[in-house]
Swiss-Prot record:
Any single GO BP term: DNA-templated transcription
Pfam families: RNA_pol_Rpb1_1 (PF04997), RNA_pol_Rpb1_2 (PF00623), RNA_pol_Rpb1_3 (PF04983), RNA_pol_Rpb1_4 (PF05000), RNA_pol_Rpb1_5 (PF04998)
Catalytic reaction(s) noted: RNA(n) + a ribonucleoside 5'-triphosphate = RNA(n+1) + diphosphate
Protein task: DNA-dependent RNA polymerase catalyzes the transcription of DNA into RNA using the four ribonucleoside triphosphates as substrates.
Name by which UniProt lists this protein: DNA-directed RNA polymerase subunit beta'
Positions annotated to bind Zn(2+) 2: C819, C893, C900, C903
Gene (UniProt): rpoC
InterPro entries assigned to the protein according to its UniProt record, in alphabetical order: DNA-dir_RpoC_beta_prime, DNA-dir_RpoC_beta_prime_bact, RNA_pol_asu, RNA_pol_N, RNA_pol_Rpb1_1, RNA_pol_Rpb1_3, RNA_pol_Rpb1_3_sf, RNA_pol_Rpb1_4
SMART domains hit by this protein: RPOLA_N
Length: 1213
């Protein structure tokens, strides 16, 4: 058996007849499966034990030899070898076909490989293969053309004309096989290369395609005639099993039926040939054999599929590989896991950040082997069997053992759908009663979990290594930051926010105002006994909190604060300043001086002078967590988060905030605002009736009026609201709801969208407190339904997008420390018109500089070349007035099959420099795919206004970008760099013409009349600049500009979509994806290389091919970059295993087999498929080939070893 972790690559080729015979353990001659009386396999049948091995371990068919001691003996009575029954999953048989049969993949696939090899059309091939026409194989001295087709009648006429034996013509796959044997690959290739020099158009395309296939045969050593089968392999019987059902009936795999048809027809053909039957009968039988083999290989590819009972098409070998239920996706990429369970989740507010509650009966089942081992070790039972019985009986002693066993043994919790890496995290189990898993409330956001009936799965890591990885890398307390943007993902929500908001409120004139306390305990005692209110402003001695970072002038003084804030600051990490105001200045620079009493000053006087501070909201808590993480990293942060959670829950309970209908305020001047709007609409309609405006203008004016009315109500609502109103507190604190929910409760619901996406002119004037009329209710139902269906569709679309993204980037891994490139990316803030989408500061954080950055005025070097830009450094650069910086970027990284650490920058999930081995491709795909469900689905209809600029937004736009499709509402771009000299309008053709004068000549662009112009006369434009509003077609931009311009454009476009929906994603994730779309080039002129024109290949392979030629003084090849959509890029990957498991399985495998492709197992998917440890993270060779050594001999890993690995994952393997 091959050790899966040792082999280096996997190759797939066409099987020659001798190869199939070498695999086979015997010929299957009969269509029988098993004897229905004895239930034993029939001899020479599809389940024969002589061919495929015994059905029971170490036992021959007749029972003469039983037990392992006869291992390897072949029984002299029944001929069965005594071995394991498992060989029935491995041993193959074969069928000797009495007539050659074509392989449907190679004849029917697009393009038809047989057709290209023989230069025949697929239709002609079909006629020959299915016995509708003769093909001339050897015309000898007759004027017939080789490969020309003759009908039955023409064939007879030609025979009479030229005499018998004067030429050779045949029909069926036999004829095709003869033709394929006659193909002289070398001569044909030379001829085609010659033809390419002069050919153009359709002829050239065909020549390139033929050359591609012939060259593949030539290089791989496959012979073209192997596309026709003379011998058919029979797959092992345990892969096409027969199982007995309860009623004594059998359920068999469809493959058995398909094989049975082939054997029946083959045997009948053999008999007919023996009997010398008439030619037409033999022909018919050969055609039926051909169809039977077609159905076995790919049922339904040609003609109507063969059906089983109930007219259900039978599943052929191809169907076994294809799709979600196929071999690749069902059994190889994901398997069911042992030691796992699932249950409903409930909240566990008392748990620590790294804990989860596991029900006892679940734990005893999951940890059974561990418990049994301990039972035997403690000598409660003599052997494992007895120990097992003890566990099953529920002996009292097992619970104490279980407690010991689970201590320090982390488990993994997973919630489907797992959209990003935070969907699986490790926790330490805590045994609980009941049947639901308990989950810490703060990790809910990462899982997107709530407690309305969600279920989660639990898995137990078994080996020591797996436990160590779970504990060190996956523990929930380590996952504070979100990998997509580096912001904390564990921010408190709902009750926790509300409690802390209530706690930090300030109020004037409450009981106890102006009291002064010596320390926290005294203040709490006063509050508990009713002398001081939580919100009243009091004084406290600064010296009672000696560990806080006070300024020197603040020590030994009295500080004005509230009792609530004393409690709030008590849970903060000691080195954080005392928080009085919810802003960044207080958090980073310390407590403001205005809160401190000067000696002899009256406290009431200071209190009266101070403004009342707003309480701490959800956003402020997020900032505090981020700052804590920045200063103290994970351990202290997770402990702080637990304290924050407990405090929030405690005080939201004490505050007792409830919501009743009386809490919804009534707006005093609602009637006035609505009457004014009615009046305005009436005026607009009057103007329209008089012909002063068009219908479109009227529609826009009416909808704008109602929108403004709604905004006026909203504004009034905010002005008149009571800050102590529970609904206002919920909204203001960020616990639940926003102003739009609030204004629907108290203001008006406003305009609704009609089923066609257009906004209806009639608004809903009522709010939910007043209640809606029947008509208003009816209007609003459409929006509600649309919301539901949109969500359902969006989830599926977003999931499929993630799958394609993961597929295209799964082999991008951090391979080395520094690629040493001299290229960089010039970045500035991303803008959309006047608005800034992403600031320069955000784009700089966590990246390495390519060149040093100087102060624009003083010329002082702010940061050197190749230095990491921290958050503070980025702020310093922006504050200095620098507008653009050249950084190291994934786009310009020179590492093969991955990225280097310097071009990538920091790992957003940890805030530290990225490690070699990090699977950044997968992280990038998840970061872009996970927020996909938050994006909108719709294309906005602006209601007939400027209708041709309906902009695609949200998820459809993201798909459009990543699939490199032509965008809707495409912008016209200029190919000339220069100045816009004239824009003329042509009323007759309803177009505008834009003239751009460049150095080399004038560019003239015709633009539709309705398009909105982006340029004016006199503007200077660069090549590839958009002249009109709209999206640029990236493929067109690639023709006009260079690769880097397209990459920069795509990056900016993706960011615009996400940022407009309020989703932040790190640039580097988009860079990784976009780079994968542009990694191929198309060879234009091969020069002196042996590349073929028109070939699509990796840039690195192309450079290698040219390097050798340039060294030897030849002419290098030229190429042009190609932009591929992510689906196409996934299918064009160098790994055929990865591509086949993605989509179009049969096409990928057909192509790979002809080329004799080798998969070097560089990506993650291909290693998962063959069951090898993945070459990322701790699976990388540099981390696995480590020998334990004495301390003094240890050296740092040499970087040469790393870059060698980057070229090929450890040749040592």
């Amino acid at each position: 058996m091959v050790d899966v972790n040792r082999f280096k690559s996997m190759q797939i080729t066409l099987a020659s007849p001798s190869k199939v015979r070498s695999w086979s353990y015997g010929e299957v001659k009969k269509p029988e499966t098993i004897n229905y009386r004895t239930l034993k396999p029939e001899r020479e049948g599809l389940f024969d034990e002589v061919i495929f091995g015994p059905t029971k371990d170490w036992e021959c068919a007749c029972g003469k030899y039983k037990r392992i001691r006869y291992k390897g003996i072949v029984c002299d009575r029944c001929g069965v070898e005594v071995t394991r029954a498992k060989v029935r999953r491995e041993r193959m048989g074969h069928i000797e076909l009495k007539a050659p049969v074509s392989h449907i993949w190679y004849f029917k696939g697009i393009p038809s490989r047989m057709g290209l090899t023989l230069d025949m059309s697929p239709r002609a091939l079909e006629e020959v293969i299915y016995f509708a026409a003769y093909v001339v194989i050897d015309p000898k001295d007759t004027p017939l053309e080789p490969k020309s087709l003759l009908t039955e009648r023409e064939y007879r006429e030609k025979l009479q004309e030229y005499g018998h034996g004067s030429f050779v013509a045949k029909m069926g796959a036999e004829a095709i096989q003869d033709l394929l044997k006659r193909v002289d690959l070398a001569a044909e290739i030379a001829e085609l290369k010659e033809e390419l020099k002069s050919a153009s158009g359709q002829k050239r395309i065909k020549a390139v395609r033929r050359l591609d296939v012939l060259d593949a045969f030539n290089k791989s050593g496959n012979k073209p005639e192997w596309m026709v089968l003379n011998i058919l392999p029979v797959i092992p019987p345990d892969l096409r099993p027969m199982v007995q059902l309860d009623g004594g009936r059998f359920a068999a795999s469809d493959l058995n039926d398909l094989y049975r048809r082939v054997i029946n027809r083959n045997n009948r053909l053999a008999r007919l040939l023996e009997l010398n039957a008439p030619g037409i009968i033999v022909q018919n039988e050969k055609r039926m054999l051909q169809e039977a083999v077609d159905a076995l290989i790919d049922n339904g590819r040609r003609g109507r599929p063969i059906t089983g009972p109930g007219s259900r098409p039978l599943k052929s070998l191809s169907h076994m590989l294809k799709g979600k239920q196929g071999r690749f996706r069902q059994n190889l990429l994901g398997k069911r896991v042992d030691f796992s369970g699932r249950s409903v989740i409930a909240v566990g507010p008392t748990l620590k950040m790294y804990q989860c509650g596991v029900p006892r009966e679940m734990a005893i089942e999951l940890f059974k082997p561990f418990v049994m081992r301990e039972i035997v070790a403690k000598e409660y039972a003599g052997n494992v069997k007895a120990a097992k019985r003890m566990v099953e009986r529920g002996d009292e002693r097992i619970w104490d053992i279980l407690e010991e066993v689970i201590k320090e043994h982390p488990v993994l919790l997973n919630r489907a759908p797992t959209l990003h890496r935070l969907g699986i995290q490790a926790f330490e189990p805590v045994l609980i009663d009941g049947k639901a898993l308990r989950l810490h409330p703060l990790v809910c956001e990462a899982y997107n979990a709530d407690f309305d009936g969600d279920q989660m799965a639990i898995h137990v890591p078994l080996s020591e290594e797996a436990q160590a990885e779970a504990r060190l890398l996956m523990l929930a307390a380590e996952h504070i930051l979100n990998p997509k943007d580096g912001k904390p993902v564990v921010t408190p929500s709902q009750d926790m926010v509300l409690g802390n908001y209530y706690l930090t409120m300030e109020d004037a004139g409450r009981e106890g105002e102006g009291m002064i306390f010596k320390d926290k305990d005294e203040a709490v005692m006063a509050y508990r006994n009713g002398y001081a209110h939580l919100h009243s402003r009091v004084g406290i001695a600064v010296d009672s909190m000696p560990n806080k970072p006070w300024k020197d002038n603040q020590r030994h003084k009295i500080m004005v604060t509230t009792v609530g804030k004393i409690l709030f600051n008590d849970i903060m990490p000691e080195d954080l300043p005392y928080l009085q105001e919810p802003n960044n200045a207080n958090l980073t620079e310390g407590t403001p001086d205005k809160y401190f009493l000067e000696p002899g000053q009256d406290i009431q006087e200071v209190i009266d002078r101070l403004d009342i501070n707003v309480p701490f909201k959800k956003k402020n808590l997020g900032n505090i967590i981020a700052e804590t993480f920045k200063r103290f990293r994970t351990t202290e942060t997770s402990a702080f988060l637990d304290r924050l959670k407990d405090l929030g829950y405690y005080h939201s309970t004490l505050a007792g905030l409830t919501v009743g209908i009386a809490d919804i305020p009534v707006i005093d001047n609602k009637a006035e605002i609505i009457d004014a709007a009615h009046h305005r609409v009436e005026e607009i309609n009057k103007a329209f009736r008089r012909g002063l405006m068009t219908d479109d203008d009227r529609y826009v004016a009416v909808t704008t009026t109602w929108r403004e009315a709604k905004e006026a109500l909203e504004k009034r609502l905010i002005e008149t609201q009571d800050p102590k109103n529970p609904i206002v507190m919920m909204m203001d604190s960020g616990a639940r709801g926003n102003i739009s929910n609030f204004s629907q409760l108290a203001g008006m619901r406003g305009l609704m969208a009609a089923p066609n996406g257009r906004i209806m002119e009639l608004p809903i004037l009522s709010n939910f407190r007043e209640g809606l009329s029947v008509l208003e209710m009816f209007f609003s139902t459409h929006g509600a339904r649309k919301g539901m269906t949109d969500t359902a569709l969006k989830t599926a679309d977003s999931g499929y997008l993630t799958r394609r993204l993961v597929d295209v980037a799964q082999d991008v891994i951090i391979r080395e420390d520094d690629c040493g490139t001299d290229r960089g990316l010039l970045i500035r803030a991303i803008t959309d018109g006047k608005e800034v989408t992403e600031t320069l500061e955000e784009r700089l954080q966590g990246r390495y500089t390519r060149k040093s950055v100087k102060h624009p005025e003083t010329g002082e070097v702010l940061i050197g070349a190749d230095q990491l830009i921290t958050e503070d450094m980025a702020r310093k650069i922006v504050d200095a007035g620098v507008e653009e910086v050249t950084i190291r970027s994934v786009f310009t990284c020179a590492t093969r099959h991955g990225v280097c650490r310097h071009c990538y920058g920091i790992n957003l999930a940890t805030g530290d420099a990225v490690e070699v081995g990090e699977a950044v491709g997968t992280i990038a795909a998840q970061s872009i795919g996970e927020p996909g469900t938050q994006l909108t689905m719709r294309t906005f209809h602006t209601g007939g206004v400027a209708s041709n600029t309906d902009i695609t937004q949200g998820l459809p736009r993201i798909q459009e970008i990543f699939e490199a499709r032509n965008p809707k509402g495409e912008a016209v771009i200029t190919e000339v760099k220069g100045n816009v000299v004239e824009i003329e309008e042509d009323a007759s053709t309803r177009t505008k013409k834009v003239y751009v004068q460049g150095k080399t000549g004038m560019g003239e662009y015709v633009i539709p009349f309705t398009a909105r112009m982006k340029v004016e006369v006199g503007d200077e434009v660069n090549r590839g600049a958009a002249l009109t509003e709209g999206s640029i077609q990236p493929k067109r931009l690639l023709e006009v500009r260079d690769t880097l311009s397209v990459e920069t454009y795509l990056l900016a476009e993706v960011q615009k979509v996400y940022r407009s929906q309020g989703v932040e994603i790190g640039d580097k994730h988009v860079e990784v994806m976009v780079r994968q779309m542009l990694r191929k080039v198309r060879v234009m002129d091969p020069g002196d290389t042996d590349l073929l024109p028109g070939t699509l290949m990796d840039i690195s392979d192309f450079t290698d091919a040219n390097k050798d030629i340039v060294i030897s003084g030849g002419i290098p090849a030229t190429s042009r970059p190609v932009l591929m959509g992510i689906t196409k890029a996934s299918l064009e990957t160098n790994s055929f295993l990865s591509a086949a498991s993605f989509q179009e399985t049969t096409r990928v495998l057909t192509d790979a087999a002809i080329r004799g492709k080798k998969d070097h197992l560089l990506g993650l998917k291909e290693n998962v498929i063959i069951g090898k440890i993945i070459p990322a993270g701790t699976g990388m060779a540099r981390y696995r080939n480590i020998e334990p050594q004495a301390m003094n001999e240890i050296e740092v890993i040499d970087h040469t070893e790393v870059s060698a690995e980057a070229v090929f994952t450890a040749e040592a393997e």
